[in-house]
Regions:
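Post-signal-peptide N-terminal segment of Sec-exported extracytoplasmic proteins
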Residues: 36-64
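Bacterial N-terminal signal peptides that target proteins for export
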Residues: 1-7
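Short, polar/charged loop or turn motifs at beta-strand boundaries
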Residues: 28-46, 74-78, 83-84, 122
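Extracytoplasmic
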Residues: 27, 52, 66-70, 92-95, ...
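A beta-strand signature from Gram-negative outer-membrane beta-barrel systems
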Residues: 94-124
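Bacterial Sec signal peptide processing site at the extreme N-terminus
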Residues: 11-32
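Extracytoplasmic/secreted envelope proteins and their assembly/folding machinery
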Residues: 42-50, 83, 91-94, 117
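Periplasmic plug
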Residues: 65-103
């Protein structure tokens, strides 16, 4: 009888500890996919990023007195401005948006990316 109780309690404990399967995986914190763009139902990239990944728009680390710095925006690999440039990019054209931290952005695009970079890839 005692073994049956221990077995039952163990079975319940295992079931409680088991991971729950979810219908959708957690989103990648550095990427906004086309599916997320469509699901959000937002018209411009700035509002989309503000809703789905607001941390991308926040300033990080120290800046100098002469150059405050801002995240840089690249559209299909071409620098188009700072985060305000996202307001002019319509989500209907977006395939994905990726955030690069300062180190990765500087490695890929060079100096001037101390606040990171937002890469917008359009649908072809």
């Amino acid at each position: 009888m005692r073994r049956a109780v221990v077995f039952a309690v163990s079975a319940v404990a295992l079931a409680a500890c088991a991971g729950q399967s979810s219908s959708s995986p957690r989103p990648n914190p550095s990427l906004i996919t086309r599916d997320e763009v469509v699901e959000a139902g937002i018209s411009d990239a700035f509002q989309l990023v503000q809703k789905l990944r607001p941390a991308w728009l926040q300033k990080r680390g120290s800046t100098s007195f002469t150059q405050e710095g801002d995240v840089r925006v690249y559209l299909d690999g071409t620098h188009v401005g700072d985060r305000e440039a996202l307001r002019g990019i319509m989500t209907i054209d977006i395939e994905s948006i990726e955030y690069l931290d300062a180190g990765r952005a500087t490695f890929r695009f060079g100096a001037g990316n101390e606040q990171g970079a937002i890469l917008v890839m359009t649908r072809k």
